């Protein structure tokens, strides 16, 4: 008997599972808020230099840019006796007395003057947040293995609530960045524990539905963020409103049961049995729960206990050629997806469209994108779907280079299309990666893939800074990287309708079988070629 069969005895899809998935899914609504929060809390408004204190305010104080608007980062050197208000030949200087902002919102950019020479600090703040997610993955993963999934989930909720609230009261930008880094670490803990506890307690036949439901909560969270940002123009209150609910989620998480596999592998058989009996009672199968014993639990999960004793590490991903290929191609696909996704998701204000409406559109495109991706995965296969999603996204991003800024509708349509393709790419990669890696290396493979996605999302804001050299440079980098990721996916094995590989030998045999079939097909085609006879 496997754990799935034990789960069937206590109720594999009853009231417990519905409540369990709901409690795991609700906090995901808030995860979207934190991931994309700087779209609204770090908006850069129209601005220009503040005139010197002893100058009379007027158009002549500021030089004009080629569009006839006040320069953002320069002003005329103030000469008290100057008599020519429109004299464009006068010397200019940086904004020594600060800036005047044309905005009804309060943002970190306005509060800490993150413009002109300091504008890189805005992108750095987002990169530091992403670095927190990157660092939090392995650190919290190790803590999760040591202390359990449930305590780490509860602690991560509490940590996100505290660090997010701390960011709302930050007295300076460095303090704000530290708290945002901790927010990123917390999100890693929440994501890791949510995935594991969802898979643990839901039957195989329902995992796709439950996982998709949780994924759609992230999409809904993007809608909620737009509404909150519109209603709350002060960045500190918006930050606090997005963080405070996690105090409540930390309390609700005490109801969520611990992973049975973790309890068994940790030798906590008595607690594992009590947890299963509690689930059985909740699902109306109390008598079935009473029949379970510790000895039965040990016997039926012996395979899990034995397999856990064999340790596989990162080096095993590079032991054989096919695994090296899979790891390289998947790493590039994950990196390019995270890299390009956040270039679009965090660039809402660049398209000259109302950011609240555009954020709703960016969130809404995920719904049809993920649905179409699921259909394509089921009928066209994983490899083709993954390749074309990244190739289409890369093409859309590169096309933005050739569309003038005045054509806002077309630029927005291309960005929305690209973002939808990248959302589908994420959905495809989660499934594809879990199917390509053998069971003994699946967790390690997913871990290294997640790292590359986070590296991409961390670097993306910094690459945007290259736009100061030439506006088209960031899109060239983002688009080309997506094309490379899509091309790499063509070299992966197709997993549609194939059983999951269990061991390294399984994937080697699978690769040999594919190679043999390909060679036989080429030989058959060659045998059908009729040589042309030359005249004598």
Curated annotation (Swiss-Prot):
Cross-referenced PROSITE patterns: MFS
Predominant localisation class? membrane
> What keywords would UniProt list here?
Cell membrane, Detoxification, Glycoprotein, Ion transport, Lipid transport, Membrane, Phosphoprotein, Transmembrane, Transmembrane helix, Transport
| Membrane protein topology class | Multi-pass membrane protein
Q: Write out the transmembrane intervals.
A: 12-32, 124-144, 159-179, 181-201, 213-233, 237-257, 328-348, 355-375, 384-404, 412-432, 472-492
Q: Which residues face the membrane's Cytoplasmic side?
A: 1-11, 145-158, 202-212, 258-327, 376-383, 433-471
Tissue expression notes: Expressed in the liver, brain, kidney, choroid plexus and weakly in the eye. Moderately expressed (at protein level) in the brain capillary endothelial cells (BCEC).
Q: Which GO terms describe its molecular function?
A: antiporter activity; organic anion transmembrane transporter activity; prostaglandin transmembrane transporter activity; protein kinase C binding; quaternary ammonium group transmembrane transporter activity; solute:inorganic anion antiporter activity; xenobiotic transmembrane transporter activity
Q: Which reaction does it catalyse?
A: estrone 3-sulfate(out) + glutarate(in) = estrone 3-sulfate(in) + glutarate(out); estrone 3-sulfate(in) + 2-oxoglutarate(out) = estrone 3-sulfate(out) + 2-oxoglutarate(in); glutarate(in) + 2-oxoglutarate(out) = glutarate(out) + 2-oxoglutarate(in); urate(in) + 2-oxoglutarate(out) = urate(out) + 2-oxoglutarate(in)
Stored InterPro entries: MFS_dom, MFS_sugar_transport-like, MFS_trans_sf, Orgcat_transp/SVOP, Sugar_transporter_CS
* Superkingdom of source: Eukaryota
Give me the ranges of the annotated region Disordered: 515-536
Ranges facing Extracellular side: 33-123, 180, 234-236, 349-354, 405-411, 493-536
Q: Which residues carry this modification: Phosphoserine?
A: 4
Indicate where this protein resides in the cell. Basolateral cell membrane
Q: Where are the annotated coiled coils located? A: none
Glycosylated positions are 81, 86
Function noted in UniProt: Functions as an organic anion/dicarboxylate exchanger that couples organic anion uptake indirectly to the sodium gradient. Transports organic anions such as estrone 3-sulfate (E1S) and urate in exchange for dicarboxylates such as glutarate or ketoglutarate (2-oxoglutarate). Plays an important role in the excretion of endogenous and exogenous organic anions, especially from the kidney and the brain. E1S transport is pH- and chloride-dependent and may also involve E1S/cGMP exchange.
Q: Which family does it belong to?
A: Belongs to the major facilitator (TC 2.A.1) superfamily. Organic cation transporter (TC 2.A.1.19) family.
**What is the recorded name of this protein?**
Organic anion transporter 3
Annotated gene: Slc22a8
